[in-house]
Amino acid sequence: MSSEVEPPQKKKQPWLPDYIVENCLAHISRSYYPKLSLVSSPFALSSYPKSSTKRDIASTTEEYFFHVCLQLPKSPLPTWYTLWIKPDQIEKKKKINTFTGNTRLVQIPSSYHYPFDQVFIFNLYGAMRSSKAMVRPPSYGLVSMF
């Protein structure tokens, strides 16, 4: 007679307290958030607006970057891109930031999205409006940016 032995249960590793994780993440540039949100859904959910408050407390400097949502003619859905400007490519002179011109437009993974109330809509003529009044995402021909 063979007796069935139950396999040992895997013990779950305890998580770090949220305040420790948030303080550590405050030192990471926001430009890495898209990749972090792919591996950590709690991070994706908590990245706004708490992170900016923690970043202020930690006195973390931030490089400049812009995100845009483009719906191209051959694409059925809008896609998010970031205009990547590396920190070492920004020179500070007399509190004025000048760019060396070495930038790239990089596609953000599709699983990463921004809270829609933090998106501003620009039409092709540069007029801006907040998306808070909008019920649906921008239509073709508009550029979203925040």
Swiss-Prot record:
InterPro entries with a match to the protein in the record: F-box/kelch-repeat_ARATH (IPR050354)
Domain of life of the native organism: Eukaryota
Protein name: Uncharacterized protein At4g39750
Organism: Arabidopsis thaliana (Mouse-ear cress)
Top-level taxonomy: Eukaryota, Viridiplantae, Streptophyta, Embryophyta, Tracheophyta
